[in-house]
Design a protein with these regions (language model features):
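Glycine-rich, basic loop-to-helix element that forms the pyrophosphate-binding segment
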Residues: 61-76
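A conserved acidic beta->alpha catalytic loop
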Residues: 38-47
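Short beta-strand-to-loop acidic/aromatic patch adjacent to the donor-nucleotide binding site
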Residues: 81-92
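N-proximal low-complexity "stem/linker" segments adjacent to membrane-targeting elements
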Residues: 1-22
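Conserved catalytic core of nucleotide-sugar-dependent glycosyltransferases
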Residues: 94-175
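Short, acidic, metal-binding catalytic loop of nucleotide-sugar glycosyltransferases
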Residues: 19-32
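C-terminal catalytic/acceptor-binding lobe
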Residues: 174-251
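Conserved donor nucleotide-binding strand/loop of the catalytic core
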Residues: 51-64
């Protein structure tokens, strides 16, 4: 199995980037994984490290939104592998058998289109109306999670995704390409609408393992400003909100 690994690095955080880049150099097999990096206004130290490691990179002097970057990376150059892997720069590989174990799970479940760490989101006001206006909406009513309309989604800081799913859904589509907050759960809903399966699984990757640095913007599709909902961000922990605080347990 071969994959193209994409990662978005941004800002003057050379130690954070050193951690991710070092883990890729140690644990991402070069004969199986092609690495493509997007560098959003990063430090000269990070640029030098990327060059030293020989990773392909795209340098931006502007701090572009995440889904704009995804759109350019996924559709700007041909992807020749059946799978893509995504990393935010605050996630990193911490186990030597990360690739082997994940590959084994995917071979065991060929019907799966996406793999990652699961979280539950309950739709904010206006978001389901946004869903029904999307080109991938196929008429399914909202799923009920915990008794309320919502979606189980892969945390956007690290996931595996079939290349054919990106092309079929034209993801990220133009309606969200300008945004930063909320695309991961809309992608999960797009897959559900199109009968694509998400498999909750993570072996060997530390996710969101840094204090929050990103934009604090209203989530995609919201008709109310929910940014006043208290958030808790702890180093080494994934973020949670009041509406999203209970993590679902999977076998």
């Amino acid at each position: 199995m071969k994959a193209t690994l994409f990662a978005l690095l941004y800002g003057d955080y050379p130690e954070l980037h050193k951690r991710l880049l070092g883990s890729l150099a140690r644990y991402a097999p070069r004969n199986r994984i092609e690495v493509r990096l997007w560098l959003n206004t990063v430090s000269s130290e990070t640029k030098a490290r990327v060059k030293m490691l020989g990773f392909q990179s795209f340098d931006s002097a502007e701090n572009l939104p995440k889904y704009t970057v995804m759109r350019r990376l996924f559709h700007g150059s041909p992807i020749k592998t059946p799978w893509i892997i995504w990393f935010d720069d605050d996630s990193y590989i911490e186990r030597f058998d990360w690739f082997r174990q994940t590959e084994a799970v995917l071979r065991k479940h060929p019907e799966v289109s996406c793999l990652g760490e699961p979280w539950r989101h309950e739709w904010f006001p206006g978001q389901w109306d946004f869903v029904t206006g999307c080109p991938w909406y196929a008429g399914l009513p909202p799923a009920l999670n915990g008794g309320n309309p919502g979606i189980i989604f892969p945390i956007g800081a690290y996931f595996w995704l079939k290349t054919e799913a990106i092309l079929r859904l034209d993801w990220p589509h133009e309606d969200i390409a300008h945004a930063h907050n909320g695309g991961d759960y809309f992608f999960a809903e797009a897959m559900r609408q199109q009968n694509m399966r998400f498999l909750p699984f993570n072996h060997g990757v530390a996710i969101n393992s840094a204090s929050r640095r990103g934009r604090n913007e209203v989530p995609i599709g919201c008709t109310v400003d929910v940014r006043e909902v208290p958030r808790r961000f702890e180093t080494g922990k994934s973020p949670s909100t009041i509406l999203n605080r209970k993590r679902r347990q999977f076998p």
